[in-house]
Amino acid sequence: MELLDDAAPAVVARGASIATIYTGSHQDHRVEGVALIAPHFIVEDISVASIAQIRNAYATTNLKEKLSRWHRDVDNAFYGWNGAWLDPDFRSWDISEYLAYIRVPVAILQGVDDQYGTMRQVEIAREECYCPVDVTVIPGAGHQPHREAPGATLDAISEFANAVLHVDDGSQGRAA
């Protein structure tokens, strides 16, 4: 965030947990909004079940090859993430407390067919957030709406960013 100088960013996060913790624990007056893509605030049964299934897919399909494009040590990245979520002690993981301290508008983009989380995540945000929560439920998308429905995802993020950055007539440019 320090690299942004005096810019007033809207945080767009595929790492929604990290963005939630940041905006809920830092009153960074440069941030004017936060868009959370497929967020997790708690662990759900569907999360654990799907993460257990993906472990099998990692061992039996070309998933490792696909992920190696993004991770230098793909086994460490995958098994670190997978093992954490499947650890019985992780079932109590809950970051919803941070939501109450977010002081900027929140957009949540949630795929209808998210295999890792349900609308309960959205309900938690609506219950806990002090600021407005704008929810876009994206048909035809699962846990990666930015990849599975890029047009709808970009439209929702652009609309949110333009609203929170007060871009209304095009004369100042458009946020995307």
Task: Please tell me what each predicted stretch does.
Residues 5-44:
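Conserved hydrolase catalytic core segment
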Residues 40-51, 116:
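A short beta-to-alpha transition loop/helix N-cap that caps and shapes the active-site region
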